[in-house]
């Protein structure tokens, strides 16, 4: 393509009159790279990213003795005030709070298949019905307290369900039994 364009340009220059031939400069090829100043950059990425001189390495989650559950599972257990704030957040988003509990297998496991995916084998039992029409986060925490009294050795979680999109939007552990 480029060679055909160049040959057309040369034909046009050769066939043109003398006044027009002087207007188009001939193609001399690419300029030598030696004429351009070149700065060599190292491949060291530590010079690019900086945290202000404070070098600290973050620990990874210990794989023994501490299991991961849902959203916020890396944090210490939430206080009542923090739980109220989380429930208020899901109410502000228009999600329906729902309380679920699990007695035997709160951790991720696969009983019937080994493929990874959203369905990881954890089916929790719903505590009562979803709290449609709930506007007060204290109502949700009262239900969590009732579930704790009924099943003191159960894991209890709060989920936020979006009934318009028919999806679970948030899920977090509200109570872990002693020893976890």
From Swiss-Prot:
It comes from the Eukaryota. Belongs to the RuBisCO small chain family. Heterohexadecamer of 8 large and 8 small subunits. RuBisCO catalyzes two reactions: the carboxylation of D-ribulose 1,5-bisphosphate, the primary event in carbon dioxide fixation, as well as the oxidative fragmentation of the pentose substrate. Both reactions occur simultaneously and in competition at the same active site. Although the small subunit is not catalytic it is essential for maximal activity. This is Ribulose bisphosphate carboxylase small subunit, chloroplastic 3. GO terms for molecular function: ribulose-bisphosphate carboxylase activity. Disulfide bonds: none annotated. Residues 1-56 form a transit peptide. GO terms for cellular component: chloroplast. The keyword Oxidoreductase does not apply. One of its GO terms (biological process) is photorespiration. It is found in: Plastid, Chloroplast.
